[in-house]
């Protein structure tokens, strides 16, 4: 127990700048800013070292078995690591394994020495045992072992941290059929429906929504910042209708409904293959001066994965299918892309599918195909024209083994736009978050995880408004959503839209007690 505690404390102390000095611990840590510390940290590793979870069980053996093949696969993925980084990671891991075996052997010997000393003390009186050469030899050997371990524990902590800080950046394996390259190399698997034909120049969703007074995005910088929006009336009903339509369909298919926290620890994000400490990051971080390590989730996938973290699922309950509607928060740091409209916004509602399967690619691949089929069914019932893409290597991120995107036609934008994504993450997330299943024999094994968008509201609003617009400015409601809106057509408002009276207006009515401004 003492040895285990010592090994647990070493990385915590050294990471905070503490060093042994004359039998005591002193702090030599220089002052560092939060942003400086973030760059060299891995929250998942720290989370484990502080005892909240076990260390990630990364599958390094597969890299060691075929290092050339692994290096080639790494080069094809987009990420921080390149093939030249792999040998150092493998070397560090091998050295760490050898050192841990040496420590284990010494700790076993130390335990045996302790037992032998206790046996001598039990059978002889104190005076006699002190003179016993065997006792003296055991005590001397015990001191030697402790000295060796005192030097080995810090080295183990150093190697362990060095290994995990790099190895946790390694991506998942890649399906052999995945196209190689960037998004331009995506393979079209299916083309469903036809492009809508108009006798007029189709308008964009924002113009349509503003004229119908169902979307507001103007003059919000002083209210909620850029890339925010309001949905009003039929716009809000469309959102609720899409969520309820999707939810009801999935509940009928046996999905378990869930709600999840919006605020989560960084370790859960990193366990899912996301990087809250990246610069820039798409993840909103709560001020660490007030709330340590809390982040706003950009997808319910993170919360659902966190639900299973450090837990086992009974084998007979597999595969698990879950559905969750949540508000998603994304920084959208590339402000040059689509600055107006609903395509890239800081917050939106999304319905997410999440699955946990047993071992082997067959089960998780089947669930991925099932999720994709449901996505296609939903979009078909909404009457949209769309295409299914097999995404290439550089679009898989860290966790995906294979990923399918669906892009819907958006006439106002004049191009396809991504509306759903589905990924098979195999055991990438479960090895980091310890998502396990228990066999009927009681054995624990790593599960596979699969996630997929069921309904991303803003992007579906774009496709629906632009595809169903009419010459008179109204919008037809798809039959699948008519019961939720109570109408088959969204028409011009009968109310008077709000009038802006804030600063920088050429004409505005006077405020109480003030003349009108011209």
From Swiss-Prot:
Pathway: Aminoacyl-tRNA biosynthesis; selenocysteinyl-tRNA(Sec) biosynthesis; L-seryl-tRNA(Sec) from L-serine and tRNA(Sec): step 1/1. It is found in: Mitochondrion matrix. It comes from the Eukaryota. The keyword Ligase applies. The modification N6-acetyllysine is found at residue 110. GO terms for biological process: mitochondrial seryl-tRNA aminoacylation; seryl-tRNA aminoacylation. Keywords: Acetylation, Aminoacyl-tRNA synthetase, ATP-binding, Ligase, Mitochondrion, Nucleotide-binding, Protein biosynthesis, Transit peptide. Pfam families: tRNA-synt_2b (PF00587). The modification N6-succinyllysine is found at residue 195. One of its GO terms (molecular function) is RNA binding. Residues 498-518 are annotated as: Disordered. Belongs to the class-II aminoacyl-tRNA synthetase family. Type-1 seryl-tRNA synthetase subfamily. PANTHER family: SERYL-TRNA SYNTHETASE (PTHR11778). This is Serine--tRNA ligase, mitochondrial. The gene is SARS2.
């Amino acid at each position: 127990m003492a040895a285990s505690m010592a090994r647990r404390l070493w990385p915590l102390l050294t990471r905070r700048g503490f060093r042994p000095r004359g039998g005591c611990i002193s702090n030599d840590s220089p002052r560092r800013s939060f942003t400086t510390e973030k760059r060299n940290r891995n929250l998942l590793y720290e989370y484990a070292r502080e005892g909240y979870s076990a260390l990630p069980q990364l599958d390094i053996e597969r890299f060691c078995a075929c290092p050339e093949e692994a290096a080639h696969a790494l080069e094809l993925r987009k990420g921080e690591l390149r093939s030249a980084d792999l040998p150092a990671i493998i070397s560090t891991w091998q050295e760490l394994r050898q050192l841990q075996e040496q420590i284990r052997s010494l700790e076993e010997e130390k335990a045996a020495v302790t037992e032998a000393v206790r046996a001598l003390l039990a059978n002889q009186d104190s005076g006699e045992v002190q003179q016993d050469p065997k006792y003296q030899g055991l005590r001397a050997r015990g001191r030697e072992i402790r000295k060796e371990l005192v030097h080995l524990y810090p080295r183990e902590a150093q190697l362990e941290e060095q290994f995990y800080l790099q190895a946790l950046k390694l991506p998942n394996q890649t399906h052999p059929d995945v196209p190689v390259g960037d998004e331009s190399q995506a393979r079209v698997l299916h083309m469903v429906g036809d492009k809508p034909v108009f006798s007029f120049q189709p308008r964009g969703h924002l113009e349509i929504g503003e004229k119908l007074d169902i979307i507001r995005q103007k003059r919000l910088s002083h209210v909620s910042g850029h890339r925010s929006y309001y949905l009003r009336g039929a716009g809000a009903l469309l959102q609720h209708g899409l969520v309820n339509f999707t939810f009801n369909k999935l509940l009928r298919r046996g999905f378990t409904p869930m709600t999840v926290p919006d605020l989560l620890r960084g370790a859960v994000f990193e366990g899912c293959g996301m990087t809250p400490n990246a610069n820039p990051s798409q993840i909103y971080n709560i001020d660490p001066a007030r709330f340590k390590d809390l982040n706003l989730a950009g997808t319910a996938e993170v919360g659902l994965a966190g639900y299973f973290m450090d837990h086992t699922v009974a084998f007979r309950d597999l595969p698990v299918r879950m559905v969750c509607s949540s508000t998603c928060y994304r920084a959208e740091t590339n402000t040059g892309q689509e600055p107006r409209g609903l395509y890239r916004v800081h917050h939106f509602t999304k319905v997410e599918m999440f699955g946990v399967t047993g071992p082997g690619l067959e089960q998780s691949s089947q669930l991925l195909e099932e999720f994709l089929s449901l996505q296609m069914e939903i979009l078909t019932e909404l009457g949209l024209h769309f295409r299914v893409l097999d995404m290439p290597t550089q679009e898989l991120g860290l966790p995906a083994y294979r990923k399918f995107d669906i892009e819907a036609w958006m006439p106002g934008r004049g191009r396809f736009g991504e509306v759903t994504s589905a990924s098979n993450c195999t055991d990438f997330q479960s090895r980091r978050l310890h998502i396990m299943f228990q066999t009927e024999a009681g054995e624990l094994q790593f599960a596979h995880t699969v996630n997929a968008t069921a309904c991303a509201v803003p992007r579906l609003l774009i496709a629906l408004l632009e595809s169903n617009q009419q010459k008179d400015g109204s919008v037809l409601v798809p039959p699948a959503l008519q019961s939720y809106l109570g109408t088959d057509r969204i028409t011009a408002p009968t109310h008077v839209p709000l009038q802006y009276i804030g600063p920088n207006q050429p004409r505005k009515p006077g405020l109480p007690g003030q003349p009108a401004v011209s």
